[in-house]
Amino acid sequence: MAAVFPVNNSSDRPKPAVLSSDRRIVGATIAVLAKLLSGFTVRWMNCAPDTCQRVYFANHTSHLDAVGLWSALPRELRVLTRPVAAKDYWGKTAWRRYLASSFNAMLIDRHDIKVHQSPVDMMLREIGDIYSLIVFPEGGRNSDGEMGEFKSGLYYLAKKRPDLELIPVYMDNLNRVLPRGEVLPVPLLSCITMGSPIYLEKGESKADFLKRARETVRKLKDS
């Protein structure tokens, strides 16, 4: 089960939109079930829960990742955090769309990206001065547990909003809780580790930044 951490309320930004009562109940139920089924522990390494705007970026191995990471956050942060999720999966049926809306997911179409409809610009427009994000820079899932190369989206988020704290996250064993191709999760123990925030450094190239960001996630695996 996730540990309880005090939350720093370091921001006085506007309040988030209030979800309907049924979606709030479903969202709370999802969080409880995710904790029970994955049995995850949460570690904050040189980092503490905070209501400031952040981008949590993590390795990606399972459809459960977005829900798992969102559920691992304290309740005060969940209402301020929007997971970015694949529209081709979470938008496939009315039931999945409803579930996604209950944890305020932002659905991105990975296969129909247009120049004038940048996913990064959409994310920044949707979060405004209110929400944090959960993203998976690899773009797709890697079921073998090995991290792929990071896509450029994280770099452009950091470049366009340098005020956002970029929090590396390593999710261990969630790919075995909901293996690729499976519908029902398998109860197992897993661990979610949050690391120290990083920022885009002055003069840092896209390639160097993405390599450094990926390495910060990888190091959490061994911490």
Describe the function of each predicted region:
Residues 144-207:
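A cross-family acyltransferase "interaction/gating" segment
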Residues 53-55, 130-136, 165-167:
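Residue-level preference for the first positions of well-ordered beta-strands
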Residues 195-197, 212-221:
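A conserved mid-domain beta-alpha-beta active-site/ligand-binding segment of alpha/beta enzyme cores
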Residues 104-129:
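Helix-adjacent hinge/juxtasegments
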Residues 126-155:
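Catalytic-site beta-strand/loop segments enriched in glycine and acidic/polar residues
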Residues 48-112:
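Catalytic core of membrane glycerolipid acyltransferases/transacylases, capturing the structured
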Residues 1-10:
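Soluble, non-transmembrane catalytic domains of enzymes that act on hydrophobic metabolites at membranes
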Residues 22-23, 29-60:
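Helix-to-loop junction immediately C-terminal to a conserved catalytic motif
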